[in-house]
Structure formats: structure tokens, C-alpha cells
């Protein structure tokens, strides 16, 4: 059975697993259905990222047609987001999909507000 690793994210988009939404506030009050969906900002864990922003490859235009060096038409400027980061993003820009029974969101990098990344060296020092 295919998993998330089989999904290919294109362009400047990221695939996010949203955090679980609670129907209860921190004070114990239960919220009516739909209240959480009206919030402007949501958080989640980044599962996959696209290759980045496409830019023209000058070597493709300037090179000789028979040359075998770097013949890709475009290059990609990589994204800041990395798999495993926690992200806060604009909910209105998210596209919700369901893949194998799991709710996922596809979001452009420009809609990410904050990234939280754990320092891998910090874990080694503990």
C-alpha cells in the first residue's frame, strides 16, 4: 500500500499534516461545529516539500546544442521549509485533501507564517 512517501509535491508547495483540532477550550467549554474552521491561522507538521521556485537555467540558453553539460531548462530555488518542521500558516490558502483516509493540506510557501525547527545538535548535547 502506498504511503505519503509516494506523493510528489510540485513547485513551491508544502504538504502538511494539520494538528488535531479540539472541540473543547482550555477552560473546558465545548465549541460548536465549524468554529475552528473560521480561525485564520492553523498549525501542523510539514511532511513533504516541493523542489522550490522554478527559475530559468542560463546554461541551457548559452550552451551549444550538442553539449551534454547541465541541459535542464529550469533550476529550482529551494524552499525554507523542511520535512519535520512545525509550521503556522494561513488557513484560507490551504487546499485540503484526503489521502488514504488521512487529512492533509497543500499550502504554498508564501502562506507559511512561522517555521519551528528543532536543532539536531541540541539533541546530541543532552
Give, region by region, the residue ranges found by the protein language model.
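Compact, glycine-rich, soluble single-domain proteins
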Residues: 2-126
Amino acid at each position: 500500500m502506498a504511503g505519503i512517501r509516494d506523493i510528489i509535491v510540485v513547485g513551491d508547495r508544502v504538504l502538511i499534516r494539520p494538528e488535531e483540532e479540539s472541540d473543547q477550550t482550555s477552560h473546558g467549554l465545548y465549541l460548536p461545529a465549524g468554529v475552528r474552521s473560521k480561525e485564520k491561522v492553523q498549525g501542523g507538521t510539514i511532511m513533504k516539500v516541493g523542489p522550490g521556485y522554478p527559475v530559468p537555467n542560463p546554461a541551457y540558453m548559452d550552451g551549444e546544442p550538442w553539449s551534454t553539460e547541465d541541459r535542464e531548462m529550469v533550476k529550482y530555488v529551494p524552499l525554507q521549509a523542511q520535512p519535520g518542521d512545525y509550521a503556522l500558516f494561513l488557513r484560507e490558502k490551504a487546499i485540503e485533501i484526503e489521502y488514504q483516509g488521512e487529512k492533509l493540506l497543500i499550502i504554498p510557501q508564501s502562506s507559511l507564517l512561522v517555521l519551528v525547527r528543532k536543532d539536531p545538535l541540541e539533541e546530541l548535547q543532552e
